[in-house]
Amino acid sequence: KGHPLCWHTVCADWLMQYDNKTILDKILKRIDRDVKAFTGTIDMWDVINEVVIMPIFDKYDNAVTRVCKDLGRVGMIKETFAAAKAANPDATLLLNDFNTSISYEILIDGCLQADVPIDVIGIQSHQHQGYWGAEKLYQVLERFESFGKPIHFTENTFVSGDLIPAHIVVLNDFLVPEWPSTPE
């Protein structure tokens, strides 16, 4: 599986020199290039990653977030999925997010109403703030099965060290004082 074709956190800095129309054009051309180049080898793609947070992401300025603010979440997803589907009509296309709140459900519903060709719902089950357990796992599956699409757990983290405290909202902001991974 290819992961991801579009993501605000790994966006090339040099894109910032362009206007939003040019940025989108370059993103879509890259999707077309990569999906075509790997057809037959990679036929399953996380098309766009973590869109729930994308237009409000303010940790740093980046081109993908800027375009998403312009197009809106569903508009951005529709553009990227259309490019991926045109490049390989037989590919399995996933929408992927770590956010399992009602916001993701609303986003998926909006995409399906806009005829975005989502084949699979991707759910990240990072457990940085605690073990999910069967109860939460079943709860998440129950909520997202209502869309009638297969569900893939696309990313999963089991923490072997300190859990991230509950008050930390942006998980990448948490730093442990030391890494107890070596005996010395």
Kindly label every feature range from the protein language model.
Residues 21, 29, 33-43, 113-122, ...:
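Structural recognition of alpha->loop->beta junctions
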Residues 63-94, 102-180:
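Glycoside hydrolase catalytic-domain groove-lining segments
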Residues 1-93, 98:
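Substrate-binding cleft and catalytic face of glycoside hydrolase catalytic domains
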